[in-house]
From Swiss-Prot:
It is a multi-pass membrane protein. It is found in: Cell inner membrane. GO terms for biological process: cellular detoxification of fluoride. GO terms for cellular component: plasma membrane. It comes from the Bacteria. It comes from Shewanella pealeana (strain ATCC 700345 / ANG-SQ1). This is Fluoride-specific ion channel FluC. The keyword Ligase does not apply. The gene is fluC. Na(+) binds at G74, T77.
Length: 124
């Protein structure tokens, strides 16, 4: 039951971060492309790589993993919003933007998970 509380606490932090980052990206870049979702997915993927690698080289408590991995990063990143925004781009006739959104979200996020892992592994 304790882990549920850690997930809830981490999730509340991740959700607020996602909201604030999305607002900032909307102010900076406008609404022509879903940069907010892209940024939170890249940031969350990088941090997931770091947490995964830290778990490989050191002992992370189940509470810490629940707080960060499931709670905070689970709420920070969003596949459903990414999918909806991509579909909206397609429905509005922006096929190139939609394909770009998929390629960048998936490709960059996989790459930054790797970078996060390598950052930790190079230090241990």
């Amino acid at each position: 039951m304790n882990n549920v509380l850690f997930v809830a606490l981490g999730g509340s932090i991740g959700a607020v971060l996602r909201y604030l980052i999305s607002l900032l990206m909307l102010q900076v870049f406008g609404s022509g492309f879903p940069f907010g979702t892209l940024v939170v997915n890249i940031l969350g993927s990088f941090l997931m790589g770091v947490i995964f690698a830290l778990g490989q080289v050191s002992e992370l408590s189940p509470e810490f993993k629940a707080f960060i991995g499931v709670g905070m990063l689970g709420a920070l990143t969003t596949f459903s919003t990414f999918s909806n925004e991509t579909l909206l781009l397609m429905q509005q006739g922006y096929l190139v933007k939609a394909v770009f959104n998929v390629v960048v979200n998936v490709g960059v996020c996989i790459f930054v998970v790797y970078l996060g892992q390598q950052l930790v592994f190079s230090r241990f």
